[in-house]
Regions:
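Surface-exposed amphipathic alpha-helices with a cationic face
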Residues: 82-90, 144-145, 149-156, 176
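Short, charged, surface-exposed secondary-structure boundary motifs
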Residues: 126-133, 191-198, 207-211
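Acidic, Mg2+-coordinating phosphoryl-transfer loop and its flanking beta/alpha structural elements
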Residues: 95, 99-100, 159-199
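Short, acidic/turn-prone active-site loops that include or flank metal/cofactor-
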Residues: 120-126, 186-190, 202-204
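Short, acidic loop-to-helix structural element flanking the phosphoryl-transfer center
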Residues: 68-103, 107
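Glycine-rich phosphate-binding loop signature in dinucleotide/nucleotide-binding domains
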Residues: 2, 91-93, 151-160, 211-212
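Substrate-recognition "cap/lid" segment bordering the active-site pocket of phosphatases
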Residues: 107-162
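Active-site neighborhood of HAD-like aspartate-dependent phosphohydrolases
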Residues: 1-54
Length: 212
């Protein structure tokens, strides 16, 4: 059995129980509008990356420090998140947080939880201020998995040495890539592609433990 060397962790619905892009859009009074666009995307009214790009561009002029301050008020962490991160960090297991959310948001959680690597949307930044994003700044619809593969390649870690944790059909590419897959509070039938189903992130600890 391959030793687990990396955990691939989805963000919204997995590490956190709120859509954090909606939350930070509240900094500029656009939380409700972001929520509406996101609902329309899930209803099939927006194709490709257009909805995500629109929501990110609400944040033009917002700073990293504003985002950090907003998330320090409330982090919206899923039950068991801190326990899981403490467990993997103590054992030197690489963690890769992957999301369509923006790098400034993921950086806040990286600092909060000691996450090793982050993969997310990369808006143009002027100093610590968000200047916007375009479709050209994404490698493609599978940009999250592309980023994961690059990090693992640099670390010399093979797919069968990884565990992916996610909650929705958007995580299926990571589930199919990783050696082991865990669905947390699954939606959209993604549990059919998972090896395990959990409802608290700390429940992933014994699964990882038996693979060390």
């Amino acid at each position: 059995m391959a030793k687990v060397k990396a955990v691939l962790l989805d963000f919204d619905g997995t590490l956190v129980h709120r859509d954090i892009l909606d939350v930070v859009c509240g900094i500029v009074g656009k939380e409700a509008e972001s929520e509406r666009i996101n609902r329309e995307f899930h209803d099939g009214k927006h194709a490709g990356l257009s909805a995500l790009i629109t929501r990110i561009n609400f944040l033009k002029g917002v700073t990293q420090s504003q985002i950090d301050a907003k998330l320090q008020q409330e982090a919206f962490l899923m039950p068991g998140a801190r326990e899981l991160m403490a467990y993997v960090n103590e054992r030197g297991i690489i963690t890769i947080l992957n999301s369509g959310n923006i790098r400034p948001v993921l950086l806040a959680y990286q600092k909060m939880l000691g996450i090793t690597h982050i993969v997310g949307s990369e808006p143009t930044m002027h100093g610590g201020t968000i200047a916007g994003i375009t479709e050209a700044q994404f490698t493609g619809p599978n940009f999250k998995l592309d980023g994961i593969k690059l990090i693992l390649e640099q670390a010399g870690t093979q797919p069968h040495e990884t565990i992916a944790i996610g909650d929705s059909p958007a995580d299926r590419p990571a589930f199919e890539f990783a050696g082991t897959s865990i669905a947390i509070n699954p939606k959209g039938g993604v549990e059919a592609f998972a090896d395990y189903v959990i409802h608290d992130l700390s429940e992933a600890i014994p699964i990882i433990d038996q693979k060390l």
